[in-house]
């Protein structure tokens, strides 16, 4: 059964949908679409990770869910349930932040892909919304590729880089900053409180954010790293569209990989 036809029958979405949600299927339906030609997309976004005083802990999860919907509408893929925990050691000083050990974050994706590959699929794509997550994803790719399972992931630093450079006005930043806040103003403005947005940028050669100016790392009392006060919806739209096009190209490139 074709993915597109099963997507319509299984979920009855209000919009044209090319892909399907694995969670909406029975195992009998899943067996029909989990074939060697299938690309399985696994969204990844933290649902409990600090993003300054103006963005929610669920920020990355909301972002992952947004891109998941866009991919479902545009790509012939099977989308697995969103993974909402991973490797975020840079933010552990801020309450509400959760992180997995590197090995756990790596092995979670290895295990998910191995389990689904038993039934046919050999190509998997992590729809990644984090920076520190790329390390365990790269390690997972090494393990899986050695087993003949192709695994790709979004390099979030590169995906929207050109668009970011074109619109960004901040001195620097990478977290809960001008760009990330702009993205959220575009995809989920209700989750942003611009009255609490701040500029908090203290570069450091040491990785990770810290609430203590005497500790190694980039000092940030707010948990932000950059200038969120410069964020606009229009900037967010430009970056989101650039990231989406990169993700779609990544998926099609993976589909063509032997």
Predicted ranges, named:
Residues 2-4, 14:
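Cleavable N-terminal signal peptides
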Residues 4-6, 215:
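Alpha-helical interaction segments
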Residues 9-11:
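N-terminal signal peptide c-region/cleavage motif recognized by signal peptidases
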Residues 14-103, 107-125, 129-258:
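Extended, histidine- and acidic-residue-enriched regions that form the cofactor-binding/catalytic faces
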């Amino acid at each position: 059964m074709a993915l597109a036809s099963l997507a319509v029958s299984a979920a009855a979405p209000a919009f044209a949908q090319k892909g399907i949600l694995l969670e909406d299927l029975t195992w009998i339906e899943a067996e029909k679409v989990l074939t060697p030609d299938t690309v399985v997309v696994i969204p990844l976004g933290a649902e409990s990770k600090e993003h300054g005083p103006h963005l929610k802990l669920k920020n990355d999860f909301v972002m992952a869910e947004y891109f998941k919907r866009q991919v479902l509408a545009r790509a012939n893929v099977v989308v697995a349930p969103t993974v909402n925990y991973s490797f975020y050691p840079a933010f552990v000083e801020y309450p509400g932040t959760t992180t997995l050990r590197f090995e756990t974050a790596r092995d979670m994706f290895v295990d998910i892909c191995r389990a689904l590959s038993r039934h046919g699929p050999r190509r998997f794509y992590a729809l990644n919304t984090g920076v520190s997550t790329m390390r365990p994803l790269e390690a997972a790719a090494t393990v899986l590729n050695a087993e003949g399972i192709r695994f790709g992931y979004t390099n979030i630093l590169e995906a929207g880089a050109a668009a970011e450079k074109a619109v960004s006005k901040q001195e620097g930043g990478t977290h809960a900053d001008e760009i990330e806040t702009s993205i959220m103003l575009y995809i989920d403005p209700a989750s942003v409180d611009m009255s609490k947005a701040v500029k908090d940028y203290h570069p450091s050669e040491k990785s990770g954010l810290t609430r203590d100016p005497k500790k190694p790392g980039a000092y940030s009392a707010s948990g932000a790293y950059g200038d969120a006060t410069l964020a606009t919806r229009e900037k967010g739209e430009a970056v989101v569209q650039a990231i989406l096009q990169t993700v779609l190209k990544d998926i099609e490139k993976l589909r063509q990989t032997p």
